[in-house]
Regions:
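Hydrophobic alpha-helical segments within soluble ligand-binding/sensing domains
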Residues: 108-111
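Nucleotide and nucleotide-moiety/phosphate-recognizing core
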Residues: 1-103, 113-127, 134-139, 146, ...
């Protein structure tokens, strides 16, 4: 079995430690000792997990155009859409809470919206990582593109580790069992 795990984020050092780049951070945790290579539309790494081939990508097309990279890698690797997992930030979830779903709407997230447009479906698995919504009205962009607070940074590694385990359970156990284990 082959999987594509796509962590959403924006390329470059300006965005590296922002809330919006949590997808990149989780994919980095999965790759821990594996180097990413610059390939078409994405940084790519590959690992084996319990007999499964897992292709990790960090689209380099910027968040709002992530669909182009994801579509390319699904087609290139001949991977079915149910073996795709998109990891993204979510302001509607409290900080650190994760929610795994087999499908759903973009919920106003422009990266997910673009993926839906490129794939022409909402029926793909996604893991949403809560970044909270502690911002004044009209300041959403500043918040999601902002750095983590010191309080968040203190517990972020633990939260990323839980998200990483959810991804591995998705790959090995399937989406239903992974949802039962990780959604609360």
């Amino acid at each position: 079995m082959k999987y594509v795990i796509a962590g959403l984020g924006n390329p470059g050092p300006t965005y590296e430690n922002t809330r919006h780049n949590i997808g990149f951070k989780i994919v980095d945790a999965l790759a821990s000792t594996i180097l990413f290579s610059q390939e078409r539309f994405a940084l790519r790494a590959e690992l084996k997990y319990k007999g499964r081939q897992v292709i990790l990508i960090k689209p380099q097309t910027f968040m709002n155009l992530s669909g182009k990279a994801i579509k390319y890698w699904l087609e290139k690797e001949k991977i079915d859409i149910e073996n795709l997992l998109v990891i993204t930030d979510d302001i509607m979830l409290p900080f650190g809470k994760i929610r795994l779903r087999p499908k759903g709407s973009h919920g106003g997230h422009n990266g997910l919206r673009n993926i839906e447009e490129e794939l022409q479906t909402q029926n793909f698995p996604r893991l949403r990582f809560g970044i909270g919504n502690n911002f004044p009205k009209g300041r959403q962009v500043d918040y999601v593109l902002g750095q983590w607070s010191s309080e968040e940074l203190n517990v972020l590694p633990e939260k990323i580790e839980k998200a990483k385990q959810c991804v591995l359970d998705f790959v090995f156990l399937g989406i239903d069992r992974a949802m039962n284990l990780h959604n609360s």
